[in-house]
Amino acid sequence: MYEYRSSRRALFTIISVGIALLTVSILHSGYSQSPSTFSVSSMVLGKDKPVSMAIDEKTSKIYGIFATSSGEKNLLYVIDVAQNKVIDTIKIGSQKNDFLTNIAIDPDRSIIYAAGQHLVNENGSDIAYDTLYVINSTNYKFKRIQLYGETEEGKEGSLAGISFNPVTNTIYLGSLYPEGGKPGLYVIDGKSLQPILIDKWQYGIKDIQLDPESHLLYAGAKYDNLISVIDESNNLIIDNITAQSPIAITLDKEKNILYEAGSDGKVNAIDLKSKKNISSIQGESVKNILYNPNDKLLYIVDQNLTNILSKNSNVTKSMAIAVNTTNNIINKFETDFIVDNIIINPSTNQVYLSGYDGNNSKLFIIKPQ
């Protein structure tokens, strides 16, 4: 999704938070021992599982990709957060042939961009095409832009992160292949919808963070163990930052800090001037991170895998915490839902989380700090 998307060596201090989902390893001595609890409301969305979501801040609508219990992933929910209700559900293409995975919004042109996969039978073989779906958010008419295809059986990767730059009208799509395929970063002009592939990585890109003001793009290469800094004006890599299996990245432009979450559950703060890690937060299974420039808090979504696998349905399975710029944990929120997604409406400073408990999905609404 697009968001307008220490000092000297010291002994690490480790603290437990809540159910010990998170421990904090920091280079600062001051931190909150007892973070307060977020003020949270929620609404039931339905029986389908949320996959990805993005918000149109102009209309106060959240668009979410949802998966059914039978594995269909072509369902789009439209949630009006002003009315606190789902106002529409739309099927994009065919439930047997179209599988959407990630979503971004162009609010100025009323367009939804979704990364996904389209299955086509060619000469008796099922070919899986990595596909960009361009969806009109008014009438939900759509077109598919096929990027790369191979036989479905044995296909080892797919499109991953998606981000949109409204200043240049450009879509960015990460292509992640741990084996074979066509890994890299697609750069797609929003007017012509013609793709260019940057293929400078062995395995490709998992997540993307844009900074339109500096014309820089940060691309997290999960299996290459690095974050590439790309000049958007010429699509050239100007720097590479070593990072351990980055799965999510977010940017504090004011302090010039890039936060990255790795597959090991650790969230690192990287000083973009020195390219050095200046602090770390150790989680168990961090799924998403997002920095909010309005309240200057870093939001972290973490999961407790032991409790998720447990038969006990009344235990904490996910936690969201907010960390300030000096690594104080300010607030936390625990739930027995499995939470993956977090978005922020920059106009209202409202934070939204989506989760699923095996029976129902919920939208959690965190009141502004």
Where are these regions (language model features)?
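Predominantly soluble domains enriched in secretory-pathway, periplasmic, or organellar proteins
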Residues: L22-Q369
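Sec-dependent N-terminal signal peptides
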Residues: R9-A20
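Basic side chains
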Residues: R8-R9, K61
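N-terminal secretory signal peptides that target proteins for export/translocation
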Residues: M1-S7
